[in-house]
């Protein structure tokens, strides 16, 4: 995997920084694990925009990724690594010894030809998945479940990982990348290692069009809108809005806490680090 800067033959190429991985499969994905994916354009079933800045973008197929890793005791061989347009991480196509194929998140260090397995007795090896009660304290994990058998929800993006820092009764304490410490039931599963493609954060798209290819539309400032469209709108000439920064719906937008308390807050041992 390499970070590539292009010759400045145009402004878009001048600022482009891309991640090149020659280990990725260059052909088509495995058809049996694809689903159609329709674009919403940010509209709901009434045709109204409910999420701004969404629209257009390249057509995509959804890759069905196995986040449960519940095929226990059956070894699998990694056939190839693939690009997935739906996530920042790469995915791996694995072939189980009984003939079934599945996609999994590709951990750092996993290559074609490797053997992986999931289940109670799986060894502590990159790509193996097992309950956290069987994983030693201090181990780096990813694709962590929050409820047993629900499927992985934590540490799924490129370069993500968590660390098991303690085990107490029916819970393990997990340290997340954000600095948050959280209790997770020991029956929940996690995969050993960290998610690959960590260089994803170093890329630069180079031009506005590359963002449009990804289905993201422009963000317009409130101060250049009309009063009917935004609380900062209107005024004569280039006025600055005349009030503290707010969202289009009037909510303070600079540091105002909007998170509602949840029942699962009791499992948070320490809040995330302040930015």
From Swiss-Prot:
**What Pfam families does UniProt report for this protein, alphabetically?**
Ribosomal_L2, Ribosomal_L2_C
Stretches for region Disordered:
223-275
Swiss-Prot/TrEMBL GO biological process terms:
cytoplasmic translation
Which SMART domains does this entry report, sorted A to Z?
Ribosomal_L2, Ribosomal_L2_C
Q: Which GO terms describe its molecular function?
A: rRNA binding; structural constituent of ribosome; transferase activity
Fetch the SUPFAM superfamilies from UniProt.
Nucleic acid-binding proteins (SSF50249), Translation proteins SH3-like domain (SSF50104)
Q: Which family does it belong to?
A: Belongs to the universal ribosomal protein uL2 family.
List the NCBIfam families hit by this protein, alphabetically. Answer: rplB_bact (TIGR01171)
Known function: One of the primary rRNA binding proteins. Required for association of the 30S and 50S subunits to form the 70S ribosome, for tRNA binding and peptide bond formation. It has been suggested to have peptidyltransferase activity; this is somewhat controversial. Makes several contacts with the 16S rRNA in the 70S ribosome.
Name of the protein in its database record? Large ribosomal subunit protein uL2
Q: Give the organism the record lists.
A: Psychromonas ingrahamii (strain DSM 17664 / CCUG 51855 / 37)
């Amino acid at each position: 995997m390499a970070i590539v800067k292009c010759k400045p033959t145009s402004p878009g190429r001048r600022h482009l920084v891309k991640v090149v991985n020659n280990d990725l499969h260059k052909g088509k994905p495995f058809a049996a694990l694809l689903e159609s994916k329709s674009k919403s354009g940010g509209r709901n079933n009434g045709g109204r925009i409910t999420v701004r800045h969404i629209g257009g973008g390249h057509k995509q197929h959804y890759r069905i990724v196995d986040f449960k890793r519940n095929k226990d005791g059956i070894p699998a061989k990694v056939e190839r690594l693939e690009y997935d347009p739906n996530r920042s991480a790469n995915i791996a196509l694995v072939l189980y010894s009984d003939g079934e194929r599945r996609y999994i998140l590709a951990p750092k260090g996993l290559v074609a030809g490797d053997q992986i397995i999931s289940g109670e007795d799986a060894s502590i090896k990159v790509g193996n998945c097992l309950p956290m009660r069987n994983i030693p304290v201090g181990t780096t994990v990813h694709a962590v479940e929050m409820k047993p058998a629900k499927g992985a929800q934590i540490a799924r993006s490129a370069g993500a990982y968590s660390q098991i820092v303690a085990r107490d009764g029916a819970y393990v304490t997990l340290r997340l990348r954000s600095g948050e410490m959280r209790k997770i039931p020991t029956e929940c599963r996690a995969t050993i290692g960290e998610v690959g493609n960590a260089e994803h954060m170093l890329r630069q798209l180079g031009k506005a069009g590359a963002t449009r290819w990804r289905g993201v539309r422009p963000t317009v400032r409130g101060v250049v809108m009309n009063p009917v469209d935004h609380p900062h709108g209107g005024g004569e000439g280039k006025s600055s809005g005349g009030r503290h920064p707010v969202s289009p719906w009037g909510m303070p937008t600079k540091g105002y806490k909007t998170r509602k308390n949840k029942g699962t807050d009791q499992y948070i041992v320490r809040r995330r680090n302040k930015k």
